[in-house]
């Protein structure tokens, strides 16, 4: 079915109402959320003497885009439900369809608005929010969360091709790896093996201090060279952060940094790569939901109801929260190795796309 795609007053009208309502709802809800968040964290702020400037500029200025993007599906759905229900209640949609505009053609400005919001959300996800998360997470670590001793156990990495590092345990308090081992392998043959009672990272000189070390080099003629000593300094393609993985850290990587991290983790055989893959797929899956929830919202609210817009808004909020919970629940399939991150994180979009198609077909034409 062909229809005229040239911009009309109707398109400008719907796009303006969509975008305006979206941002008004966004900032109203964010204001309420900030009030509740302050009341929840005020004791931490006072107890740990957080400066007012840090609270405002380091935390809440960076908290707003994070929260705004995380709940953007909810805001999109409520926006579409609200102003479309209002249009239906005022018989505007009936008037539009009576003028010869098809239901499909009426959807064009909705899809265009959803595309603008999706592009805005994607830009935030890939480049802006990761930088703002650095300050937000640093603030939470310093003033909100309880400080605990970070200990990594049985850490094993391929730090470079043919070079493997192992530590029985690692303490972030003193940057020390215990029972440290470094192996170098070439052509499936062990070339050398270094063991040390401890490996301490010197933050000033950026070197690892291997204490009570033992070095064994394996030669092709089956003769071994053995050395030992109290301490030796060396540089390794290994950082303190590699020993203790904080899943929140992936939120601070922009698109290109996250791809580099994933490549590095895959090369190392790092099991924590699942967190990075979840983050990467989530950044693309979430903006795409703007299209799905927009179609669902129009299909649900374009018909005039006797009860007014209350039922539509209630149903919209319920479906939006169901989608968000489904997005979070789908991550469990990755943690349990049931599904790959790409399938698990896109599963809610697939399911809700089917629902959107069914609702759209049932909507008034």
Label each PLM-derived region with a short phrase.
Residues 1-161, 172, 189, 221-223, ...:
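Transmembrane alpha-helices
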Residues 159-205, 209-213:
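Structural signature for solvent-exposed beta-strand/loop edge elements and short helix-capping sites
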Residues 196, 228-230:
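N-terminal amphipathic/hydrophobic interface segments
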Residues 215-218:
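Hydrophobic lipid-interacting interfaces of membrane-associated proteins
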């Amino acid at each position: 079915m062909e229809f005229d795609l040239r911009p009309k007053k109707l398109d400008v009208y719907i796009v303006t109402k969509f975008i305006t309502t979206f941002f008004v709802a966004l900032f109203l809800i964010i204001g309420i959320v900030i009030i509740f968040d302050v009341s929840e964290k005020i004791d931490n702020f006072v107890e740990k003497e957080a400066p007012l400037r840090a609270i405002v500029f380091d935390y809440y200025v960076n908290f707003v885009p994070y929260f705004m993007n995380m709940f953007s599906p909810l805001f999109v759905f409520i926006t579409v439900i609200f102003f479309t229900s209002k249009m239906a209640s005022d018989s505007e949609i009936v008037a539009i369809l009576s003028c010869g505009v098809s239901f499909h053609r009426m959807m064009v400005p909705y899809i265009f608005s959803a595309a603008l919001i999706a592009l805005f959300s994607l830009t935030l996800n890939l480049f802006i929010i990761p930088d703002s998360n650095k300050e937000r997470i640093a603030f939470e670590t310093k003033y909100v969360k309880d400080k605990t001793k970070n200990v990594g156990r049985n850490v094993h990495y391929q730090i470079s091709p043919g070079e493997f590092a192992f530590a029985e345990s690692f303490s972030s308090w003193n940057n020390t790896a215990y029972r440290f081992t470094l192996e170098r392998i070439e052509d499936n043959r062990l070339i050398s093996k270094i063991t040390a009672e401890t490996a301490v990272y010197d933050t000033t000189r950026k070197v690892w201090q291997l204490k009570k070390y033992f070095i064994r080099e394996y030669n092709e003629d089956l003769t071994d060279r053995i050395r030992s000593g109290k301490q030796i300094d060396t540089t390794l393609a290994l950082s303190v952060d590699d020993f203790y993985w904080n899943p929140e850290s992936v939120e601070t990587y922009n698109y290109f940094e996250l791809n580099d991290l994933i490549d590095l983790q895959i090369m190392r055989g790092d099991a924590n790569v699942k967190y990075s893959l979840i983050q990467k797929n989530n950044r693309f899956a979430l903006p795409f939901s703007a299209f799905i929830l927009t179609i669902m919202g129009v299909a649900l609210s374009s018909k005039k109801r006797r009860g007014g817009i209350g039922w539509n808004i209630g149903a919209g909020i319920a479906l939006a929260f169901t989608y968000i919970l489904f997005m979070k629940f789908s991550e469990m399939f990755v943690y349990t190795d049931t599904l790959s991150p790409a399938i698990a994180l896109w599963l809610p979009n697939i399911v809700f796309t089917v629902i959107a198609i069914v609702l759209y077909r049932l909507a008034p034409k």
